Amino acid sequence: IADIQATLAFARTENLPISIRGAGHNIAGNSLADGAVMIDLSTLRSVSVDPVAQRVFAGPGATLGDIDHETKEFGLAVPTGINSTTGISGLALGGGIGWLTRRFGMTVDNLISAQLVTAEGDVVIASATENPDLFWALRGGGGNFGIVTRWEFAAHPVSNVFAGLVVF
């Protein structure tokens, strides 16, 4: 977090735009901007599971595969997308539709909280009870409200799931 705050302060001082890269899944390179300082979060892939509370905590660079790998040991799943290389940050900030959406809702419906660094460098928590307007904005509103440094999601018990595409 200190590195992010220092980078934001430098960019402000030098009047430089910033760009944020989550897991780097987007093939169009939307996290790139000419002349900008990029904050690359792709190595922040930690995932921890609290099986009793049925909560998952993920770093901003975690992929859906990272999350699935950690939750399956406990028979839990977070409703995410369909591609294991997709980053949780881009997916959650965009809404998140996947195999479990019909049963448990979109990814953002299962977001409990997000820790983020604001443009001013402040570390805040956004949840239904703490900074609720910011929480509402994060839930599908894109990545322009701060730099998320930790996600907290509700996880759900699941048995074996068979899913795939049928092509004729």
Language model regions located:
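Soluble FAD-dependent oxygen oxidases
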Residues: 1-168
